Amino acid sequence: MAAVTQLGYVGLGVSNIEEWEHFATDVLGLASNGIDTDGNLSLRMDEYSHRFIIQPTGKDDLQFVGWQVTDEPALREMAGQLRDSGIEVTDGTDDENKSRRVEGMIKFDDPEGTPTEIFYGPPISFDRPFNSPRAVGFVTSEQGLGHVVLHVENLDRTVEFYRDVLGMKISDFIRNLAFFHCNPRHHSLALIESKAPKKLNHFMIQTESMNDVGATYDMVLDGDIPLTRGLGRHTNDHMTSFYMKTPSGFDVEYGWGARTVDDSTWQVVRHEKGSIWGHRPPVAAAAK
């Protein structure tokens, strides 16, 4: 059975691409590749040529999710698994592969209608090292970009799809959330059963240093970026993080220090709470 190996890239549809470029570089510490002739902005965080593709759609939500597989045979096997499960699959065109800068990809909607791409052969730029404008380093490599958390209306059906068709493994549960891993990162995907106006609840990027999280936290507190949840430590992945609002209205989690999964010893559990401590919403402005 073929299985995805990492969260390779995320596509976001936004209404203000210039504001996103400022936020991504000056706050998150990602590197901009600039805005291309199609009006799309791509962002780096490691040796991959891009991890985020920002498109000026006005949607202010998730545009697509890109999951990586090892090679072309794995991609073809995955396409077969999807079709066998009743999912309509199309191959990426030459122009689409060129746009994503991959050797090959397939496209489909997951059971909740999330536009999803599975690809192989991303371009790696060791000759052009990632250079963060804020001197931030990120935990990626075999762990991929980070994670995304998606709102779904039917949790059981969607869990079965990502586990039984895409080959992900359940890490644990918290209330109405299911967490999945496809490499040592505790979760590359989480699903929350909830009716919400946006498909994307948040995405997460993990820094190599707690100092980077702390410095960014100070920047948010001292500036005009909305803080949605203060510093805290999660029960399941043990990450120390905080949440802030992006220019599109969904959140980004900025964290450090998550534990990893060893499948030879890992056991699925259900946590009673989401955080060991912290992650509290900010004090209401009226209390100031």
Q: What positions do the PLM features span?
A:
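N-terminal beta-strand motif that seeds the catalytic metal site of vicinal oxygen chelate
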Residues: 1-18, 62-67, 123-156, 186, ...
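Conserved donor-binding loop and adjoining core beta-sheet/short helix segment
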Residues: 35-37, 45-70, 93-95
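Short, charged/polar, Gly/Pro-enriched secondary-structure boundary elements
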Residues: 48-53, 113-116, 186-190, 250-251
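Conserved active-site tyrosine of GNAT-family acetyltransferases
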Residues: 20-25, 82, 113, 158, ...
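Vicinal oxygen chelate
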Residues: 6-15, 57-141, 144-153, 178-179, 224-288, ...
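Core segments of cupin and vicinal oxygen chelate
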Residues: 2, 8-50, 150-187, 192
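Short, structured motif recognition centered on aromatic/hydrophobic residues
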Residues: 6-10, 30, 43, 52-54, ...
